[in-house]
């Protein structure tokens, strides 16, 4: 059991039951999955870029990502239907908690001029989305071996019914929200 899983069971669940008045511990919001997505627009012209993006995401997530393909042809972007244009991976259970722990305690403090994450990134249904502009903030990525700086999208899916419940859940995990 990871550190954040243990913290969730021993500290977060009782705190959220006390705050929101849940009658059952199973009604307390929990993390379902974390989805990492990296769109690589240059992959249409250079296939090596996509291979490097897949390798970076595999190092960051600890599992092999799937390559996403374009759904439609867009002439202005010079892509066709079915061409590989990015990669994504979904983390669940212990890998999810390990990634969240590294994100909160190691990666986000390494971001330049970091003053916290804006709390308006919730979607209205208890899920949280954020972006990271540089993949080099993760300790698994060697800065000297990176061919290009690429960002990624991080989507945290919870069982919370409202944004207030989801924010309380992430606050309990010491998520660095801006005041």
From Swiss-Prot:
One of the record's GO cellular component terms: ribosome
Cited InterPro entries: Ribosomal_uL5, Ribosomal_uL5_bac-type, Ribosomal_uL5_C, Ribosomal_uL5_CS, Ribosomal_uL5_dom_sf, Ribosomal_uL5_N
Record GO terms (molecular function): rRNA binding; structural constituent of ribosome; tRNA binding
GO terms (BP aspect): translation
UniProt entry keywords in alphabetical sequence: Ribonucleoprotein, Ribosomal protein, RNA-binding, rRNA-binding, tRNA-binding
Classification via Pfam families: Ribosomal_L5, Ribosomal_L5_C
Role noted for this protein: This is one of the proteins that bind and probably mediate the attachment of the 5S RNA into the large ribosomal subunit, where it forms part of the central protuberance. In the 70S ribosome it contacts protein S13 of the 30S subunit (bridge B1b), connecting the 2 subunits; this bridge is implicated in subunit movement. Contacts the P site tRNA; the 5S rRNA and some of its associated proteins might help stabilize positioning of ribosome-bound tRNAs.
Subunit composition and interactions: Part of the 50S ribosomal subunit; part of the 5S rRNA/L5/L18/L25 subcomplex. Contacts the 5S rRNA and the P site tRNA. Forms a bridge to the 30S subunit in the 70S ribosome.
Family: Belongs to the universal ribosomal protein uL5 family.
HAMAP family xref list: Ribosomal_uL5_B (MF_01333_B)
Protein name, per record: Large ribosomal subunit protein uL5
């Amino acid at each position: 059991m990871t550190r954040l899983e243990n913290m969730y069971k021993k500290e977060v669940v009782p705190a959220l039951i006390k705050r929101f008045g849940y009658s059952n511990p199973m009604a307390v919001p929990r993390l379902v999955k974390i989805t990492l997505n990296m769109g690589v627009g240059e992959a249409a012209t250079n296939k090596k870029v996509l291979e490097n993006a897949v390798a970076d995401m595999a190092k960051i997530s600890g599992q092999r990502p799937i390559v996403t393909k374009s759904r439609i042809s867009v002439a202005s972007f010079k892509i066709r239907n079915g061409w590989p244009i990015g990669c994504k991976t979904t983390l669940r259970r212990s890998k999810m908690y390990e990634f969240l722990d590294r994100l909160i305690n190691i990666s986000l403090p390494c971001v330049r001029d970091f003053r916290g994450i804006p709390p308006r990134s919730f979607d209205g249904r208890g899920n949280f989305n954020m972006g990271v502009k540089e993949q080099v903030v993760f300790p698994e990525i060697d800065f000297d071996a990176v061919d290009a700086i690429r960002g990624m999208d991080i989507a945290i899916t919870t069982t919370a019914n409202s944004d207030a419940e989801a924010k309380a859940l992430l606050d309990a995990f010491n998520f660095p929200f801006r005041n």
